[in-house]
Amino acid sequence: KIDPTKKYVNNHYHPKEAEFISINQYFIDKKVNYSAIGMQAHMQTDYGVLSETDLWNLLEDYSKFEKEIHFTEITVTSSKRFKDWEEHKIYLKKRDDLRNQGKDLNLESLDEYEIYQADYLRDFFTLAFSHPDLTSITIWNLTDLNAWRGHAGGILDKELNPKKSFYALKKLIKEDWSTKTEIIQKVKKPIVFNGFYGDYLGEVTIDGIKYNFSFNHSAGNNEAIKVIIQ
């Protein structure tokens, strides 16, 4: 029984697999009621890193289903990457053996990889954000402390200090993708501007008196937005 107030995501850890495309096509054909396609991208090996072409083609492959696309888990590590899955498995087995002995094995964040992590996440978010069907990106680890598989995949370090990637994403989200505008307009005339989706706070001055207002601009809304000033 489907709860219409919930958003259901068909999620897979390896979206490059043709089987996942087939599963989504099967769901569409059978009229399964779900909202979004979820995919994971844990880039802990050189082989697993998505190039710009890989990322765009992936989004295009799934856009034909006319569903929201979510990156439900992404990891871009600032620690050493492994060549491929076989090399990665050797490390994971060694780590598991140590953890079974009450010890631990974590990969240290490296300066050169912190620069790479910041640059890659900035480019990944920028390209993904530009695709009209992409609606959500979730970074799998906020901090390097107890990060998955011991990789330094957070945007905060083990002491919860911001890494370069934190500042790169902060600039994108809080500056580049925020709308700030100042308009001189006649009373009773509509205000027209281009802006990103989201919540807006505004201030209008009429006859020297300042009034505040707020509104939400969301996808799919093509009507004029009415606001109340107070």
Which stretches of residues belong to each language-model region?
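Sec/Tat-exported extracytoplasmic proteins
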Residues: 3, 12, 41, 132, ...
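The substrate-binding groove and active-site-proximal loops of carbohydrate-active enzymes
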Residues: 11-14, 40-49, 106-116, 156
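Short helix-capping segments at alpha-helix termini
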Residues: 2-6, 29-33, 131-133
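Short helix-capping and hinge/turn segments at secondary-structure transitions, especially at repeat
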Residues: 29-32, 63-68
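Distinct, well-ordered alpha-helical segments
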Residues: 15-30, 49-59
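Aromatic-rich peripheral "rim/lid" segments of glycoside hydrolase catalytic domains that contact
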Residues: 54-66, 77-230
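Aromatic-lined carbohydrate-recognition surfaces of secreted/lumenal glycan-active proteins
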Residues: 1-20, 67-80, 135-144
